Every structure is written in structure tokens, then in C-alpha cells.
Swiss-Prot record:
NCBIfam families: L28. The gene is rpmB. It comes from Helicobacter pylori (strain G27). GO terms for molecular function: structural constituent of ribosome. Signal peptide: none annotated. This is Large ribosomal subunit protein bL28.
Amino acid sequence: MAKRCALTFKGPMVGNHVSHANNKNKRRLLPNLRSIKIQLDDGTTKRIKVAASTLRTMRKGA
């Protein structure tokens, strides 16, 4: 399964690990995904993966 938010499509980013000697190694920065249940229009529930930042926005009601 892709490490991607089901609503905002946020996915992994690429960055660097930087040591004290200023050596740089590539790393992946993964989104903070949470599994939630969402109720569909027909009354059934579905489990989706949503980023924590998206979840905060949903709870604010924006």
C-alpha cells in the first residue's frame, strides 16, 4: 500500500541526514499516516489512511 494520504495525496519527501561532520545521506520523510473509519453516504464505513495534519483540519471543521 502506498504511503500516501487518501484525501490530500501527501506522500513521502526526500531529504538528507546531516552528521556533525556535515556528511549528507539521502533519507525519506514519510507522512504521519493514521488509519480512520469514515462513513459513506450509503451508511457503510470504510477504513482509509489520512495524514495527521489532514485529520486536524477535518476536526476543525474547515
